[in-house]
A protein has these predicted regions:
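Conserved non-cysteine loop/helix-boundary elements of the Radical SAM core domain that shape
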Residues: 187-359
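Short, well-ordered secondary-structure micro-motifs within conserved domains or adaptor modules
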Residues: 2-3, 20-22, 26-79, 88-89
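Accessory, often N-terminal, substrate/partner-engagement and coupling regions
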Residues: 77-103
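N-terminal [4Fe-4S]-dependent radical SAM core
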Residues: 99-103, 123-169, 217-218
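Short N-terminal binding/cap micro-motifs at the start of the first secondary-structure element
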Residues: 11-16
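Local cysteine-cluster metal-coordination motifs and their immediate loop/turn environment
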Residues: 171-187
Length: 359
């Protein structure tokens, strides 16, 4: 079923489309001008201090079904957008749930870690029981998924730093040894490296400014993540200088991840340098263990090099390793993807992240 989505608030078009896809699958939400089996119209109104959201579904025969929800207006930046989005999605969700007869296990949630919502409820002073009711009443989570969240929270007790005035910092290194065919990130080939030193100088200055800003705001920096690009495309001295600067200005971190990224950028010297700093976690990202596919997408390493880099990291003492793979790469097939997964499972990294190719 294809549903043409029309809204008076274009900024929320994709959010409404996410809800449509919950019930009718990928490709169900289409532009208003495209041929569709039904039209979903969203009307936003604001009066007397209330938001009023109405969704009307009209089928090809002209028959209509609708749902309306209201809530007090919330003013102020990000929180205003968040609360308005929740109301819009909830109103749309309730209508489509009624008409489709379907019950998504995660309710109306799309594109968010549900544990974050659970923690937010607890940080706002609610008991676990009250937080569970909120997740069920506001987001329509199934009992099974709420129980799963409880299990996750129990497992994380003592591991998570939930100070209200805490923040996490991402540090981007926009350089790679080669550019992958599918890549849409703001990164480029490192080439002769002439841009690295000017970038590092600016980055070190920004780290100092970020640390000072956190102090002024009373924020504790909890987690650090250096990603890219490929951070390990920097030379060992360059990466050493960056890590020392992070330690000096951010202090002790509960978790500190460095994307070691491509196996061909790693050697014993660089891995030992990472280990000498308080790096608690690294990523070694093959994307696929199929050599033909690696060549096709522009990766300059082999599956064998991935295994060698992983085993070297283990021998140097890294006990928390993530490995990224991508499903749907050019020339990759279901059997070859299954082989990639099987090879990674044999290595037994602490975490495997599976991305789907998006062009």
């Amino acid at each position: 079923m294809k549903i043409a989505v029309q809204t008076s608030l274009p900024a929320f078009q994709n959010d409404i489309g996410d809800v449509v896809r919950l019930f009718y699958g990928e490709g169900a939400a289409v532009e208003e001008t495209q041929q569709a089996d039904a039209r979903l119209t969203h009307i936003h109104e604001e009066s007397n201090g209330e938001w009023r959201e109405t969704f009307v579904l009209t089928d090809c025969s002209g028959r209509t079904e609708q749902n309306t929800l209201s809530a007090p207006v919330v003013s102020g930046g990000l929180e205003e957008k968040r609360q308005k989005k929740r109301l819009i999605k909830r109103c749309c969700y309730m209508l489509l749930k009624r008409l489709s007869g379907r019950q998504p296990a995660w309710g109306s949630l799309t594109g968010i870690r549900p544990t974050r919502l659970y923690y937010q409820q607890l940080e706002n002073g609610k008991t676990r029981g009250e937080a569970r009711h909120t997740l069920q009443d506001l987001f329509d989570l199934s009992q099974e998924k709420i129980d799963l969240l409880d299990e996750i929270l129990d497992a994380q007790q003592g591991l998570m730093d939930r100070r209200a005035r805490a923040c996490d910092v991402y540090i981007g290194i926009p350089f790679c040894t080669t550019r992958c065919a599918y890549c849409s990130f703001s990164s480029g080939e490192i080439g002769d490296g002439r841009l690295v030193e000017p970038y590092l100088a600016a980055l070190l200055h920004e780290i100092e400014a970020c640390a000072e800003m956190a102090r002024e705001m009373g924020l504790h920096i909890r987690v650090g993540y250096i990603g890219g690009g490929t951070p390990s495309s920097l030379t060992t001295p360059q990466l050493d200088r960056l890590l020392a600067h992070v330690e000096r200005h951010f202090g002790a971190l509960a978790e500190f991840t460095v994307e070691a990224g491509r196996p061909d950028t790693l050697d014993a010297q660089k891995l030992r340098m990472l280990r000498d700093h308080p790096v608690t976690r690294i990523s070694i990202n093959p994307q696929t263990m199929n050599d033909a596919t690696l060549t096709r997408i522009g990766r300059a390493h082999t599956a064998k090099q991935t295994v060698e880099a992983y085993e070297l990291a283990r021998s140097i003492g890294f006990d928390d390793i993530n490995m990224d793979i991508i499903a749907g790469l050019p020339t990759d097939t279901l059997p070859s993807f299954e082989q990639t997964v099987e090879k990674l499972l044999e290595l037994r990294p602490e975490n495997i992240t599976v991305h789907t190719l998006s062009v």
